[in-house]
Amino acid sequence: MMTENREQSPSYKRVLLKVSGEALMGDGPSGVDPVMVDMVAADIADVVASGVEVCLVVGGGNIFRGLAAAAKGMDRAQGDYAGMLATVINALMLQNALERRGMETRVMTAIQMAAIAEPYIRRRAVRHMEKGRVVIFAAGTGNPFFTTDTAAALRANEMECDALFKGTQVDGVYSADPRRNPDAERYDQLTYLEVLARDLNVMDAAAISLARENKLPIVVFNMHAPGSFGAVMRGEGLFTKIIEAD
């Protein structure tokens, strides 16, 4: 039975939001839904207005997936670089939506693209957030064979974030894909080791291990519900929290 999480609202000062490319598709099969992008921007703006420093890592699976292309014969590294470019497209869309709402925003890329974004420099990114700017990290880690989930765990640790929030198409972590298996079990809380041992397909093993090594909490929630980011920040609604064992 699904139960709504009711926990004492934690006090977050700085967080990283991982927005999957699929979360930006809306109900479409691919591409970017401008309505969905605007809704995500509105949620982020509300959280920033509450005094929380926010940075983002965006995926690119709504546009291109290097792993899928490699399965069809494309060189894996080339496919991953193409996927990095897809994340930059999503980042620019989110930047535009945030700036239309009056939010100062900076896009920083792991691969230099000086005409459209700043190069990723850790200290500069921290300074941007201290000034109240939203920082969007794009192009993953800048290296092939690493997912944007791993990039999210890496950047969250580099930015010394209090937690990593992953916005997806479902309201937490399940034992199987609930869109395909109606009997899938939903979890309110898991440990890093449980995620790895059960091979739960929420983030790749490298990302989970990186979070575990640095005791970085991960919160997985449904990005498609308006106001969901702010709600889970307050400990409300449905989500799954991944933490170290007691």
Swiss-Prot record:
GO BP annotations listed: 'de novo' CTP biosynthetic process; UDP biosynthetic process
Pathway given in the UniProt record: Pyrimidine metabolism; CTP biosynthesis via de novo pathway; UDP from UMP (UMPK route): step 1/1
GO molecular function: ATP binding; UMP kinase activity
Catalyzed reactions: UMP + ATP = UDP + ADP
SUPFAM superfamilies reported in the protein's UniProt record: Carbamate kinase-like (SSF53633)
Keywords of the record: ATP-binding, Cytoplasm, Kinase, Nucleotide-binding, Pyrimidine biosynthesis, Transferase
Record bears the keyword Transferase: yes
Domain of life (superkingdom): Bacteria
Subcellular location: Cytoplasm
Single GO cellular component term: cytoplasm
EC number: 2.7.4.22
Keyword tRNA processing: no
Annotated positions binding ATP: K18, V19, S20, G21, G61, R65, T168, Q169, Y174, D177
Enzyme class: transferase
PANTHER family: URIDYLATE KINASE, URIDYLATE KINASE PUMPKIN, CHLOROPLASTIC
Similarity field: Belongs to the UMP kinase family.
Role played: Catalyzes the reversible phosphorylation of UMP to UDP.
Quaternary organization: Homohexamer.
Protein name as annotated: Uridylate kinase
Native species: Gluconobacter oxydans (strain 621H) (Gluconobacter suboxydans)
Taxonomic lineage of the native organism: Bacteria, Pseudomonadati, Pseudomonadota, Alphaproteobacteria, Acetobacterales
